[in-house]
Amino acid sequence: MRRWLHLCALAVLAGCATSTPPPPTADGWQPLALPGKALTRYSWTEKDGRPALEATSERSASIWRKRLEPALTPVREVRFSWWVQHLIPGANVSEVDHEDAVARVIFGFGGDIDSLPMRTRMKFELAQALTGEAPPYATLMYVWDSKLPVGTVVINPRSDRIRKIVVDSGPAELRRWRDHRRDLAADFRLAFGEEPGPLQSMAVMTDSDNNRGSARTWYGPVELD
């Protein structure tokens, strides 16, 4: 039971993790470690003439996150882009044991945690004990999956407070920039069936730990319109 709770707690850490001070040029973005996981390497660079954050994952999982001031950050449209070198064999964001993604853009939302079921609150309490901060009430991810059709909504197999929307799939668009514009509020309603609370954080994540693989991805700016 304790191991199950620990795994579930890891699943809600997209919005809270062990942080290190941000580089001076990171504009508030910070690298975030997940307990017990090797670090994905993030570095500022350029890719095909665009400024980019390069993510290199070798059997690793960690996050690059920016906290937002909820009162000053209305939920609105978002623009983001990514450039993926290759897929991870066997990865599938809907399967517990294969839940890796070459590219994720992540948004954490506030809400009334006391309204959630007791089991969910227990996961949140364990996550807070592991990291020192409370996880978001709800987390929405845009992901690139190896096989799932574009538009698929996935409930995280370990925590239903994390939902994913597949916006790229398969190998056809590899090794080129993919630009996305999404209505964040509409996508939240689609994924969770409720209105979004205040926007608390945004992040990117490339991970390959569950499949013991590797991934290399470049992220363009994540911009709220």
Spans of features found by a protein language model:
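Extracellular/luminal beta-rich ligand-recognition
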Residues: 100, 110-158
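Extracellular glycan-recognition surfaces and repeat-rich motifs
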Residues: 25-50
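Sec-dependent signal peptide recognition
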Residues: 2-10
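Extracellular beta-strand elements of beta-rich domains used
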Residues: 202, 221-224
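Extracellular beta-strand ligand-recognition surfaces/modules
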Residues: 105, 160-170, 174-212
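C-terminal motif of bacterial Sec signal peptides marking the signal peptidase cleavage site
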Residues: 14-15
